[in-house]
């Protein structure tokens, strides 16, 4: 597998890497995109954004619209894509995509097996359409802390819905 770590990335670098990783995939590929950073909501437009380090305080050309991210993800040839977004207003990422709204809790084993055969897009977010807790006093957000803890303590194959449920339950309990 290939890994690309972007720390404190600027708009152009972020966009170029997302495009590279979503466009240059084959049908057998799986892709994980993890974003931890600032997010914003443009209330008048009802649009969510990721804010790279060079983004201005008010909406500008350096705000990365969730719509663009959604389009890159939808058009990718990759079989499975998981996006984990730990930012304020991250719940806007998959709103209005036109896809089926499948709550993780409603999925059965049979439907999960069916999804394994199809092209899937899964988004885990640290919250809905609101600000999220930045830190619980540690080095990471409450969401990231539990995500890391769950992955480290797991010693077998973990389905995405189980990871989501574990992190979600913890965050709801402690936020």
For the regions a language model picked out, list residue spans one by one.
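Active-site-proximal C-terminal subdomain of hydrolase catalytic domains
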Residues: 3, 81-175
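Residue-level recognition of the N-termini of beta-strands and the immediately preceding loop/turn
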Residues: 1, 29-31, 121
């Amino acid at each position: 597998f290939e890994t690309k770590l972007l720390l404190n990335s600027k708009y152009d670098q972020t966009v170029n890497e997302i495009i590279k990783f979503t466009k240059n995939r084959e049908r057998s590929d799986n892709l994980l995109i993890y974003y931890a950073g600032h997010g914003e909501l443009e209330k008048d437009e009802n649009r969510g954004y990721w804010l790279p380090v060079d983004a201005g305080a008010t909406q500008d050309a350096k705000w990365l619209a969730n719509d663009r991210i959604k389009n890159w993800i939808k058009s990718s040839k990759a079989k499975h894509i998981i996006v984990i977004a730990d930012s304020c207003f991250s719940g806007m990422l998959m709103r209005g995509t036109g896809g089926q709204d499948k709550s993780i809790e409603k999925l059965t084993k049979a439907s999960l097996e069916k999804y394994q055969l199809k092209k899937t897009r899964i988004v885990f977010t640290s919250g809905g359409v609101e600000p999220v807790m930045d830190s619980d006093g540690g080095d990471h957000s409450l969401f990231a802390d539990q995500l890391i803890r769950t992955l480290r303590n797991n010693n077998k194959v973990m389905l995405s819905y189980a990871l989501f449920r574990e992190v979600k339950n913890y965050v709801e309990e402690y936020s």
